[in-house]
A protein has these predicted regions:
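Glycine/proline-enriched, intrinsically flexible loops and inter-domain linkers
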Residues: 1-410
Length: 410
């Protein structure tokens, strides 16, 4: 964007939003068993939403409704895009007013100072870290390995993901953007100062990211490209626990977003569910909260039951699920719901086969659990990644992981 007199380029105004339905092979556009990017929903290449101040929503609608897996709610997508465009316009006007009041040069100078403040903060923090080289591994529930070697020295933090397994057969593949998001988040935790999030935090951080499930190749044809939705919401969480482990500042948090998606031809619903956070030196973990790579609020029970074919019967803290230690990990959540009409259910979760790790002698948190109680009396234990067709009166029970404990129990 430019200053109001169009004489100086000031920067960009941008926003990012989740669109809960973008097509794909199952309602909610998060199919747990997708084998290609195309099966996860409509793939839109870089496209102008406005051109010369003229909206192009007709062209966008054609892309949203394109075969083979069109959006089930294109009208919602278009409304959300209009809201995002309005937010950008508001941001543009605010920045232009700032430049008009104080001068474009002054605004640019302060932007530079904010970035430099972040760079200085991580530089100071690096001087307090013990120089050396540490390697950590984490395994997804299916055994897939994530590996990072972190080296501190010469005023730098170097992170090398060599040794991470190759392309994932499912949708737990990530992208360099996801990896960088996890890294900058961990760097911000290390800094532990009220520094605005900006690129300056990465000034003294180097990332080596070979071809692997964190950096796969993407052919032009979406039907041949790897799926990534699990990488975005689940691998990202496990990456944070992986990167925190060598620094030893906190035990593992739940390491999952507990993605729950259900829908049918008339509706689609998606939520993420909190859990326990890890304990650390001098503090217990928090109960029943979101952590790390997600901060979404959950739908109010009244709204959930009014708009969707489901009855929420229990939403409670999962007692004693945090890892024991001198300081105890936070407890997870129990969420139980009964469906009132047939729906397609998808679950995309982690830490069901193992609990989030403890540190310094602390115990791991309890793994998550999930199962169905069918109306015919049958009980079905559900895997970390699951898809089921449900009938009216079927009951779903989800128990999310607790956080890891810190320190040996005295």
């Amino acid at each position: 964007m430019c200053s109001s007199d169009l004489e100086q380029l000031l920067g960009y105004v941008a926003n990012r939003a989740h669109h809960a339905e973008l097509g794909g092979i199952s309602p909610g556009s998060m199919p747990p068993l997708a084998k290609s990017l195309a099966e996860e929903g409509v793939v839109i290449p870089p496209t102008f939403l406005y051109r010369g101040s003229k909206a192009r929503f007709g062209e966008i609608e054609k892309l949203l409704t394109a075969k083979p897996y069109p959006s089930r709610s294109p009208e919602d997508n278009l409304a959300d895009l209009k809201a995002q465009a309005a937010a950008n316009l508001l941001g543009t006007q605010a920045l232009q007013r700032l430049a008009a009041t104080h001068g474009a040069g002054t605004v640019a100078d302060y932007m530079g100072q904010i970035r430099q403040r972040a760079a200085d903060a991580i530089a100071r923090r690096i001087t307090t870290l013990e120089p050396g080289r540490h390697t950590a591994t984490e395994r997804l529930d299916d055994g897939t390995q994530l590996k990072a070697t972190i080296e501190v020295g010469d005023g730098k933090i170097r992170i090398d993901f060599t040794g991470t397994d190759a392309l994932h057969s499912g949708n737990f593949n990530a992208t360099p953007a996801i990896v960088q998001s996890a890294v900058i988040y961990v760097v911000r935790l290390l800094v532990n100062e009220p520094v605005p999030l900006n690129e300056g935090l990465m000034e003294h951080v180097e990332i080596t990211l070979p071809r692997c499930l964190l950096n796969p190749e993407f052919p032009d044809d979406p039907a041949q490209a790897p799926p990534v939705v699990g990488g975005n919401v689940e691998t990202s969480q496990r990456l944070v626990n992986l990167l925190l482990k060598p620094f030893g500042i906190v035990a593992a948090s739940q390491g999952t977003m507990n993605n729950l998606i259900f829908g049918n031809e008339r509706c689609s619903y998606y939520e993420t569910i909190g859990g326990g956070t890890g304990a650390g030196p001098g503090f217990d973990g928090a109960d029943a909260v979101h952590s790390h790579m997600t901060n979404t609020a959950i739908t109010d029970p009244e709204v959930l039951e009014w708009r969707f074919p489901v009855r929420l019967e229990r939403f409670a803290i999962r007692k004693n699920s945090g890892g024991q230690g001198e300081f105890t990990g936070g407890n997870g959540i129990v969420r139980e719901m009964v469906f009132t009409e047939p729906v397609s259910l998808s679950l995309l979760t982690q830490n069901r086969t193992q609990g989030p790790y403890g540190l310094n002698g602390g115990q791991a948190g309890h793994p998550g659990e999930q199962h169905l109680a069918k109306r015919n009396g049958q009980e079905i234990e559900l895997a970390s990644v699951a898809q089921q067709e449900l009938e009216a009166s079927d009951r779903l029970i989800i128990k999310t992981p607790g956080g890891g404990g810190w320190g040996e129990i005295n």
